[in-house]
Amino acid sequence: MSVDVIDLRNFYSQRLGVVARRLINRGIRAHWPDAQGQRVLGIGYPTPYLGLFREDAERCLALMPAVQGVLKWPTARPTLAALVDERELPLPDSAVDRILLIHALEMSDDPGDLLREVWRVLAPSGRMIAVIPNRRGLWVRTDNTPFGFGRPYSRSQVTQLLRETWFTPVGWTEALYMPPVKRGWVLRSAVVWEFASTTSGFRDACRSSFLSRFAIAFLSAPLPARSSISGAHSDRAGVW
């Protein structure tokens, strides 16, 4: 089940969405400190996150699936976003150096086809990050965020899917330990939740993961015990 692009935009304009974006951005930045001279592509609804790279990257594009819809991005500049068929991306082979998947894999009717297209347009030794809901996480148990829609994954399921689509798992990172509630005190303490969970026993209970032809993927944090994933192709790696 896909989420409409208007609902995605509305989520990220709310306080809970702002906090989620900030926490996920921290994880993305940890793996990709910069994108100087790189060709960066976002698939799904990546625009809240592509701002990390738009100024430094050689080129930065957003492709949004037809079933979801598309919004102009960036709003005050020439558009860099397009509506596409996710099974036939309008790019030549090895066209980009880095790909960010978010609100994409879990929403896809055929995630295998999507990842094969990602592999095709990703340059050898390119990198992918996939943000994926953890099937045992708190965030998939409520429909007040986009992470509660579509098909969530376990670490083993993502590992298998990556291997079937020519990526080899290589590592993972965690994010979104805080519960997905809109209470002010929870939102204000979001960074504390992240820090405490990565330095305590909650590490295995609540986690997310990053994927990289090198792929990097991360899942939204789980309940006890949750997991994340990383993946890599023989010449293109993935982290999750």
Predicted regions, residues:
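Hydrophobic beta-strand segment of the Class I
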Residues: 99-100
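C-terminal lobe and adjacent flexible extensions of AdoMet/dcAdoMet transferase-like proteins
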Residues: 195-240
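A short glycine-rich, Lys/Arg-flanked "PGG" loop and its adjoining helix->strand segment in the class I
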Residues: 112-127
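Conserved catalytic loop of SAM-dependent methyltransferase domains
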Residues: 170-196, 205-206
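Class I SAM-dependent methyltransferase Rossmann-like catalytic core
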Residues: 1-34
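Conserved class I S-adenosyl-L-methionine
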Residues: 127-152
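Class I SAM-dependent methyltransferase SAM/SAH-binding core
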Residues: 26, 31-89
